[in-house]
Amino acid sequence: MFNILIVEDDSFKSKSLSDFINLHMSNINIEIATNLQCAITKVNNSLFDLILIDMAIPSHPIHSGTGSPINLLNGGLQVILELQYLKRSDNCIVLTQYPDIEICGEYFPVKNASINIKELL
């Protein structure tokens, strides 16, 4: 079984990704995390062969009495940092609709982001 985690808060995008993966792969298990809190929980509880990570995700789900989620433009980076903290080597692909990714208060072009993320780790 090939385990995939999709970290994406937009249900249309996560369904599109799931549909594409299901069309091209078999014997897979896909889990969805729609916010940072859920993604961190899933990463701590399971191993994944591949993680697709949207960089801009909300901090937590919307529930009555929990306060409004904060939209974290680099929330996906927190997932990668959690994997590093856990000494994990799950394969990750970063997804974003923005031309730049914020890393430690600086913006880097998406095409260079993997280098900058590795330097951070």
Question: Locations of the language-model features?
Answer:
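Two-component/phosphorelay signaling modules centered on CheY-like receiver
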Residues: 11-31
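Receiver (REC) domain switch-region micro-motif
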Residues: 51-53, 83
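Acidic, metal-coordinating helix/loop segments flanking the phosphotransfer/catalytic sites
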Residues: 18, 32-50, 58-60
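Conserved acidic E/D residue at the C-terminus of a beta-strand in Rossmann-like folds
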Residues: 8
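The short loop immediately C-terminal to the conserved phospho-acceptor aspartate in CheY-like receiver
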Residues: 56-61, 70
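A short, hydrophobic beta-strand element within the central beta-sheet of small alpha/beta folds
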Residues: 69-118
